[in-house]
Design a protein with these regions (language model features):
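Intrinsically disordered, low-complexity serine/threonine-rich segments
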Residues: 10-11, 156-158, 311
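Conserved acidic functional residues
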Residues: 137, 190-191
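Short, Lys/Arg-enriched N-terminal segments with co-localized hydrophobic residues
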Residues: 1-17
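Acidic, glycine-rich active-site loops and adjacent beta-strand->loop/helix elements
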Residues: 95, 160-161, 191-192, 214-215
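Residue-level detector of alpha-helix initiation sites
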Residues: 42, 192-193
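Conserved active-site-proximal phosphate/metal-binding subdomains
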Residues: 173-183, 187, 193-334
Length: 334
Protein backbone atom coordinates (compact mmCIF):
# COMPACT_ATOMS: atom_id res chain seq x y z
CA UNK A 1 0.00 0.00 0.00
CA UNK A 2 1.51 3.30 -1.08
CA UNK A 3 1.39 6.15 1.45
CA UNK A 4 0.79 9.63 0.05
CA UNK A 5 2.08 12.37 2.37
CA UNK A 6 -0.06 15.49 2.47
CA UNK A 7 2.30 18.48 2.79
CA UNK A 8 -0.44 20.62 4.32
CA UNK A 9 -0.21 18.63 7.54
CA UNK A 10 2.53 17.30 9.77
CA UNK A 11 1.89 15.01 12.72
CA UNK A 12 2.83 16.06 16.26
CA UNK A 13 2.89 12.81 18.22
CA UNK A 14 3.44 14.40 21.59
CA UNK A 15 0.14 16.30 21.27
CA UNK A 16 -1.72 13.71 19.17
CA UNK A 17 -3.02 16.40 16.81
CA UNK A 18 -2.46 17.46 13.25
CA UNK A 19 -0.37 20.58 12.79
CA UNK A 20 -1.10 22.43 9.57
CA UNK A 21 1.78 23.65 7.46
CA UNK A 22 1.12 26.48 4.99
CA UNK A 23 2.78 29.78 4.16
CA UNK A 24 0.17 31.54 6.28
CA UNK A 25 0.63 29.39 9.39
CA UNK A 26 4.35 30.06 9.15
CA UNK A 27 3.94 33.80 8.60
CA UNK A 28 1.60 34.31 11.55
CA UNK A 29 2.79 31.44 13.77
CA UNK A 30 -0.69 29.92 14.05
CA UNK A 31 -1.86 26.30 14.07
CA UNK A 32 -4.55 26.64 11.41
CA UNK A 33 -4.56 28.95 8.36
CA UNK A 34 -7.75 30.74 9.32
CA UNK A 35 -8.09 34.50 9.78
CA UNK A 36 -11.27 35.86 11.36
CA UNK A 37 -12.47 38.69 9.16
CA UNK A 38 -12.87 42.12 10.70
CA UNK A 39 -16.47 43.23 11.11
CA UNK A 40 -17.46 46.83 11.79
CA UNK A 41 -18.83 47.57 15.27
CA UNK A 42 -18.45 43.99 16.52
CA UNK A 43 -14.92 42.55 16.10
CA UNK A 44 -13.22 43.36 19.39
CA UNK A 45 -10.33 42.10 21.48
CA UNK A 46 -12.42 39.40 23.14
CA UNK A 47 -13.25 37.74 19.82
CA UNK A 48 -9.69 38.17 18.52
CA UNK A 49 -8.26 36.54 21.65
CA UNK A 50 -10.69 33.62 21.40
CA UNK A 51 -9.56 33.04 17.83
CA UNK A 52 -5.93 32.88 18.94
CA UNK A 53 -6.75 30.45 21.73
CA UNK A 54 -8.34 28.24 19.06
CA UNK A 55 -5.15 28.29 16.99
CA UNK A 56 -6.20 30.90 14.44
CA UNK A 57 -5.69 34.62 13.84
CA UNK A 58 -8.29 37.03 15.17
CA UNK A 59 -8.70 40.54 13.79
CA UNK A 60 -9.96 43.57 15.68
CA UNK A 61 -12.15 45.77 13.50
CA UNK A 62 -11.65 49.53 13.47
CA UNK A 63 -14.82 50.33 11.52
CA UNK A 64 -17.31 52.09 13.76
CA UNK A 65 -14.79 52.54 16.58
CA UNK A 66 -12.79 55.54 17.75
CA UNK A 67 -9.01 55.30 17.95
CA UNK A 68 -9.27 55.07 21.75
CA UNK A 69 -11.77 52.21 21.46
CA UNK A 70 -9.42 50.40 19.09
CA UNK A 71 -6.61 50.87 21.62
CA UNK A 72 -8.84 49.45 24.37
CA UNK A 73 -9.63 46.40 22.23
CA UNK A 74 -5.95 45.83 21.48
CA UNK A 75 -5.11 46.00 25.18
CA UNK A 76 -7.98 43.65 26.00
CA UNK A 77 -6.52 41.10 23.58
CA UNK A 78 -3.08 41.59 25.12
CA UNK A 79 -4.43 41.15 28.64
CA UNK A 80 -6.14 37.90 27.68
CA UNK A 81 -3.36 36.48 25.52
CA UNK A 82 -0.16 37.87 26.96
CA UNK A 83 2.79 38.89 24.82
CA UNK A 84 3.94 37.15 21.68
CA UNK A 85 0.49 36.02 20.52
CA UNK A 86 -0.97 36.53 17.08
CA UNK A 87 -3.84 38.93 16.43
CA UNK A 88 -4.40 41.75 13.98
CA UNK A 89 -6.27 44.99 13.44
CA UNK A 90 -8.14 45.99 10.31
CA UNK A 91 -7.25 49.42 8.94
CA UNK A 92 -10.10 50.96 6.92
CA UNK A 93 -8.47 53.56 4.70
CA UNK A 94 -11.72 55.41 3.96
CA UNK A 95 -12.42 55.97 7.65
CA UNK A 96 -12.10 59.61 8.77
CA UNK A 97 -9.93 58.58 11.74
CA UNK A 98 -7.57 56.34 9.75
CA UNK A 99 -4.46 58.32 10.75
CA UNK A 100 -5.30 58.12 14.45
CA UNK A 101 -6.06 54.39 14.23
CA UNK A 102 -2.82 53.76 12.35
CA UNK A 103 -0.89 55.58 15.07
CA UNK A 104 -2.52 53.41 17.73
CA UNK A 105 -1.63 50.29 15.74
CA UNK A 106 2.00 51.38 15.56
CA UNK A 107 2.15 52.45 19.21
CA UNK A 108 0.72 49.13 20.38
CA UNK A 109 3.00 47.06 18.11
CA UNK A 110 0.16 44.99 16.70
CA UNK A 111 1.53 41.81 15.03
CA UNK A 112 -0.27 42.31 11.71
CA UNK A 113 -2.73 44.57 9.94
CA UNK A 114 -5.30 43.83 7.27
CA UNK A 115 -5.81 46.84 5.03
CA UNK A 116 -8.90 47.62 2.98
CA UNK A 117 -11.07 50.28 1.36
CA UNK A 118 -8.32 52.24 -0.36
CA UNK A 119 -4.76 52.24 -1.70
CA UNK A 120 -2.62 50.25 0.76
CA UNK A 121 0.77 51.01 -0.81
CA UNK A 122 1.63 54.22 1.11
CA UNK A 123 0.99 52.43 4.41
CA UNK A 124 3.51 49.63 3.98
CA UNK A 125 6.59 51.67 4.90
CA UNK A 126 5.38 53.15 8.22
CA UNK A 127 3.76 49.89 9.31
CA UNK A 128 6.80 47.80 8.41
CA UNK A 129 9.00 50.34 10.18
CA UNK A 130 6.97 49.63 13.34
CA UNK A 131 7.50 45.88 12.85
CA UNK A 132 3.94 45.20 11.69
CA UNK A 133 3.08 42.73 8.93
CA UNK A 134 0.89 44.14 6.16
CA UNK A 135 -1.89 42.05 4.61
CA UNK A 136 -3.99 44.09 2.16
CA UNK A 137 -7.37 43.00 0.81
CA UNK A 138 -7.32 42.97 -3.00
CA UNK A 139 -10.24 42.71 -5.46
CA UNK A 140 -8.35 42.04 -8.70
CA UNK A 141 -5.20 40.57 -10.24
CA UNK A 142 -3.58 43.90 -11.09
CA UNK A 143 -3.64 45.17 -7.51
CA UNK A 144 -2.52 41.77 -6.19
CA UNK A 145 0.64 41.96 -8.28
CA UNK A 146 1.26 45.59 -7.32
CA UNK A 147 1.03 45.01 -3.58
CA UNK A 148 3.23 41.92 -3.81
CA UNK A 149 5.88 43.89 -5.68
CA UNK A 150 5.58 46.71 -3.11
CA UNK A 151 6.34 44.42 -0.19
CA UNK A 152 3.05 43.09 1.16
CA UNK A 153 3.61 40.18 3.54
CA UNK A 154 0.48 38.39 2.31
CA UNK A 155 -2.73 39.25 0.48
CA UNK A 156 -6.39 38.56 1.09
CA UNK A 157 -8.30 37.89 -2.13
CA UNK A 158 -11.95 38.63 -1.43
CA UNK A 159 -14.75 37.56 -3.75
CA UNK A 160 -18.15 39.15 -4.15
CA UNK A 161 -19.62 36.39 -1.96
CA UNK A 162 -18.29 38.16 1.14
CA UNK A 163 -20.45 40.08 3.55
CA UNK A 164 -20.00 43.84 3.84
CA UNK A 165 -18.12 45.86 1.26
CA UNK A 166 -17.07 43.65 -1.62
CA UNK A 167 -16.05 43.62 -5.27
CA UNK A 168 -17.67 42.39 -8.45
CA UNK A 169 -15.80 39.13 -9.14
CA UNK A 170 -16.42 35.72 -7.59
CA UNK A 171 -13.78 34.16 -5.37
CA UNK A 172 -13.10 31.23 -7.70
CA UNK A 173 -12.56 33.53 -10.68
CA UNK A 174 -10.25 35.72 -8.59
CA UNK A 175 -8.20 32.72 -7.49
CA UNK A 176 -7.92 31.50 -11.08
CA UNK A 177 -6.69 34.92 -12.18
CA UNK A 178 -4.38 35.72 -9.27
CA UNK A 179 -2.79 32.51 -7.97
CA UNK A 180 -0.41 31.87 -10.91
CA UNK A 181 1.36 35.21 -10.36
CA UNK A 182 1.59 35.33 -6.56
CA UNK A 183 4.38 33.90 -4.41
CA UNK A 184 3.53 35.45 -1.05
CA UNK A 185 0.81 33.83 1.11
CA UNK A 186 -2.60 34.23 -0.49
CA UNK A 187 -5.69 34.13 1.73
CA UNK A 188 -9.04 33.28 0.11
CA UNK A 189 -12.14 35.10 1.38
CA UNK A 190 -15.79 35.38 0.48
CA UNK A 191 -18.53 32.87 1.21
CA UNK A 192 -16.32 30.40 3.11
CA UNK A 193 -18.06 29.09 6.22
CA UNK A 194 -16.95 25.47 6.62
CA UNK A 195 -14.25 22.90 5.98
CA UNK A 196 -15.36 22.31 2.42
CA UNK A 197 -14.61 25.90 1.53
CA UNK A 198 -11.27 25.77 3.35
CA UNK A 199 -10.28 22.53 1.60
CA UNK A 200 -11.28 23.86 -1.82
CA UNK A 201 -9.22 27.01 -1.27
CA UNK A 202 -6.15 25.06 -0.16
CA UNK A 203 -6.43 22.63 -3.08
CA UNK A 204 -6.54 25.56 -5.51
CA UNK A 205 -3.33 26.90 -4.02
CA UNK A 206 -4.36 29.39 -1.34
CA UNK A 207 -2.30 29.45 1.86
CA UNK A 208 -5.33 30.01 4.05
CA UNK A 209 -8.77 31.56 4.33
CA UNK A 210 -10.49 34.52 5.93
CA UNK A 211 -13.93 33.87 7.43
CA UNK A 212 -16.22 36.52 8.86
CA UNK A 213 -19.85 35.47 8.76
CA UNK A 214 -19.23 32.08 10.41
CA UNK A 215 -17.82 33.81 13.49
CA UNK A 216 -20.80 36.14 13.81
CA UNK A 217 -22.42 33.16 15.51
CA UNK A 218 -19.59 32.71 17.99
CA UNK A 219 -20.45 33.10 21.66
CA UNK A 220 -17.45 35.40 21.98
CA UNK A 221 -18.88 37.71 19.31
CA UNK A 222 -20.67 39.41 22.17
CA UNK A 223 -21.13 42.85 20.62
CA UNK A 224 -23.46 41.58 17.89
CA UNK A 225 -27.08 41.94 18.98
CA UNK A 226 -28.92 38.64 19.62
CA UNK A 227 -31.59 39.69 17.11
CA UNK A 228 -28.93 39.93 14.41
CA UNK A 229 -27.58 36.50 15.29
CA UNK A 230 -31.06 35.03 15.07
CA UNK A 231 -31.61 36.70 11.69
CA UNK A 232 -28.49 34.96 10.38
CA UNK A 233 -29.67 31.63 11.78
CA UNK A 234 -33.06 32.11 10.11
CA UNK A 235 -31.56 33.09 6.74
CA UNK A 236 -30.91 30.87 3.73
CA UNK A 237 -29.07 31.20 0.44
CA UNK A 238 -31.75 33.37 -1.17
CA UNK A 239 -31.66 35.96 1.62
CA UNK A 240 -28.33 37.50 0.55
CA UNK A 241 -28.56 40.80 -1.34
CA UNK A 242 -26.18 43.49 -2.56
CA UNK A 243 -27.02 47.16 -2.12
CA UNK A 244 -25.13 49.88 -3.96
CA UNK A 245 -23.91 47.82 -6.93
CA UNK A 246 -24.70 50.60 -9.41
CA UNK A 247 -22.90 53.21 -7.29
CA UNK A 248 -19.58 51.34 -7.24
CA UNK A 249 -19.82 50.79 -3.47
CA UNK A 250 -21.39 47.36 -3.12
CA UNK A 251 -22.40 46.13 0.32
CA UNK A 252 -23.75 42.61 0.94
CA UNK A 253 -26.14 41.75 3.73
CA UNK A 254 -29.44 40.11 4.63
CA UNK A 255 -32.57 40.97 2.73
CA UNK A 256 -35.10 42.91 4.81
CA UNK A 257 -37.37 45.95 4.74
CA UNK A 258 -34.41 48.32 4.45
CA UNK A 259 -32.73 46.47 1.57
CA UNK A 260 -36.01 46.19 -0.35
CA UNK A 261 -36.52 49.95 -0.06
CA UNK A 262 -32.89 50.70 -0.98
CA UNK A 263 -32.90 48.44 -4.03
CA UNK A 264 -36.19 49.90 -5.22
CA UNK A 265 -34.69 53.39 -5.03
CA UNK A 266 -31.34 52.31 -6.50
CA UNK A 267 -32.78 50.67 -9.59
CA UNK A 268 -35.35 53.41 -10.08
CA UNK A 269 -32.51 55.85 -10.68
CA UNK A 270 -32.44 57.65 -7.33
CA UNK A 271 -29.49 60.05 -6.94
CA UNK A 272 -26.50 59.03 -4.84
CA UNK A 273 -27.43 61.58 -2.17
CA UNK A 274 -30.78 59.86 -1.65
CA UNK A 275 -29.17 56.43 -1.41
CA UNK A 276 -26.53 57.69 1.00
CA UNK A 277 -29.15 59.25 3.26
CA UNK A 278 -31.21 56.07 3.14
CA UNK A 279 -28.32 53.83 4.18
CA UNK A 280 -26.72 56.11 6.78
CA UNK A 281 -26.47 54.39 10.15
CA UNK A 282 -28.08 51.14 9.03
CA UNK A 283 -25.04 48.98 9.81
CA UNK A 284 -25.01 50.04 13.45
CA UNK A 285 -28.79 49.86 13.63
CA UNK A 286 -28.74 46.23 12.57
CA UNK A 287 -25.62 44.98 14.34
CA UNK A 288 -25.76 46.87 17.63
CA UNK A 289 -29.38 47.96 18.07
CA UNK A 290 -30.81 44.71 16.72
CA UNK A 291 -33.28 46.30 14.31
CA UNK A 292 -33.39 43.48 11.78
CA UNK A 293 -35.85 45.21 9.44
CA UNK A 294 -34.64 48.81 9.25
CA UNK A 295 -30.95 48.11 9.80
CA UNK A 296 -28.62 46.23 7.45
CA UNK A 297 -27.07 43.06 8.83
CA UNK A 298 -23.87 42.44 6.89
CA UNK A 299 -23.26 38.77 6.08
CA UNK A 300 -21.91 36.68 3.23
CA UNK A 301 -23.73 34.42 0.79
CA UNK A 302 -23.22 31.05 2.50
CA UNK A 303 -26.05 31.13 5.02
CA UNK A 304 -28.12 27.96 4.81
CA UNK A 305 -26.13 25.83 7.24
CA UNK A 306 -25.37 28.52 9.82
CA UNK A 307 -27.89 27.29 12.34
CA UNK A 308 -26.45 27.59 15.84
CA UNK A 309 -24.36 29.70 18.20
CA UNK A 310 -21.16 27.99 19.38
CA UNK A 311 -17.93 28.86 21.19
CA UNK A 312 -15.08 29.84 18.86
CA UNK A 313 -13.12 26.74 19.90
CA UNK A 314 -15.97 24.46 18.85
CA UNK A 315 -16.46 26.27 15.53
CA UNK A 316 -12.77 25.94 14.69
CA UNK A 317 -12.70 22.27 15.68
CA UNK A 318 -15.65 21.59 13.36
CA UNK A 319 -13.99 23.46 10.49
CA UNK A 320 -10.64 21.74 10.98
CA UNK A 321 -12.17 18.26 11.17
CA UNK A 322 -14.25 18.80 8.04
CA UNK A 323 -11.29 20.24 6.16
CA UNK A 324 -9.14 17.23 6.98
CA UNK A 325 -11.90 14.86 5.84
CA UNK A 326 -12.36 16.75 2.57
CA UNK A 327 -8.63 16.77 1.83
CA UNK A 328 -8.38 13.07 2.59
CA UNK A 329 -11.27 12.36 0.22
CA UNK A 330 -9.73 14.57 -2.47
CA UNK A 331 -6.50 12.58 -2.35
CA UNK A 332 -8.45 9.46 -3.37
CA UNK A 333 -9.76 10.98 -6.59
CA UNK A 334 -6.57 10.24 -8.55
Amino acid sequence: MKFHFNPIFSYRKEMDIMSWNTKLTKLLSIDYPIIQGAMAYISDGVLAAAMNHAGCAGVIGSGGFSADEVRDSIRTAKDILGNGKCYGVNLMLQAPNVDDVAQVICDEKVPFVTIGAGNPLPWFEPLHHAGIKCIPVVPNAKLAKRVQDAGADAIIVEGMEAGGHDGKVTLMALLENILPDIEIPLVAAGGIVDGRGVAASLIMGASGVQMGTRFLLAEECHLLHPNAKQAIINANDTDSVVCGFTTGDSVRGLRNKFSDKYLQEEYSGAPLSTLTALSRGTNRKGAIEGDTENGFILAGMSLTHLTKIQPVQEIVEDIVSETERCLANASRVI
